[in-house]
Amino acid sequence: MRFSRGLSVESAFIVRAPVKTTLGLLQNWNPTRHSELKVYLSGDLSGRGPGEFQSLSTAPGNSSVKAFVEATEKLPGDPSKLQLSAAEVKEFAPGSGSEGAIPAPVVTFWSQVLSQRLKSFVSGGLSSQPAYQTAGGNIVPEEEIAALLKESPSARSQFAPLISSTAIGGGRGSVSPNLYWQLFDVEGQAAVSLNAFYARPVGDGWQTADLGYYGSGGFYALVSFHQLWPVQVNGTDATLVWRVDLTSASALSELRGVERLGSGAAMMREVQKGIKAFLRDAR
């Protein structure tokens, strides 16, 4: 991939369940059940406001979450370890309250940031998302997704029906997403994300897309596509899944040659780890 911040990996696997069952499993899968994936919290969203993120106060008291708290408490002076807009950086207000792994002022700050970004996404799609403020300039999530798709012609062609009918292709899209958020580990520091899951029937199968349109760390933007085809395994209905993961991240921009190949291999290992966990739950 010529896009310096982009990376793409592909994988395929069989789910021993009919397509509709597999689709439901993908839509409702909860990775927090698998400690090796290091997803600490995950919750559905309806856009009701900051209160939807109050479960941040129940985060585990591990070193990853502690690093996330410490990075937040350095705002607004030092935003270097978080991905925020220039306006968001200024919103943090230090205060008292230390119950739980994430203190109340930190919970309040992130609840506001996530709620505002969620509201913007629901009303305007990717184009409404504020740019990340970085040392090298502003990073716009919509432009990151467009660059990833441009460099992935096979995925862009295969998933064109889904892309054109969702926020991935611009605007709000005509297909309504399932919205959710997560708290997860990124190389020793926890991060929060906002995501939208889309699904659409195509032919005798289904296509899905899991769009990460905001991440406080780990990625600028990402999308995981799944093509689901009905197949038979030993006379039983099953699903053949082709998965394509496209990721834009700051850590990728300086990698070249062997280092970039190594990063691709590492990403594939993480994807395979997630697939194995999913297949265990799908039995």
Where are these regions (language model features)?
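Eukaryotic helix-grip
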Residues: 1-283
